[in-house]
Amino acid sequence: MHEQLPLHDRALEARLIELETRLSFQEQALNELSEALADARLTGARNAELIRHLLEDLGKVRSTLFADAADEPPPPHY
């Protein structure tokens, strides 16, 4: 089939095949990046929830240790 096409048309067809191949790879890369972004967002949400719980626990511990504000040590810059 290629032998019947003029040289210009064969070059055009080769370029079209190259572009279709690149597009296919770009679509695959986009899907992989999309999945990675979704995973990163999920990890970030989990970490934010974990930090929230840890801060709550820290507040409870501080309340127990320093029930009176006078018992609390001064900030480090004093």
From Swiss-Prot:
Gene3D superfamilies: 1.20.5.300. Disulfide bonds: none annotated. It holds the Pfam family SlyX. It comes from the Bacteria. NCBIfam families: PRK00846.1 (NF002024). Belongs to the SlyX family. This is Protein SlyX homolog. It comes from Xanthomonas euvesicatoria pv. vesicatoria (strain 85-10) (Xanthomonas campestris pv. vesicatoria). The lineage of its organism: Bacteria, Pseudomonadati, Pseudomonadota, Gammaproteobacteria, Lysobacterales.
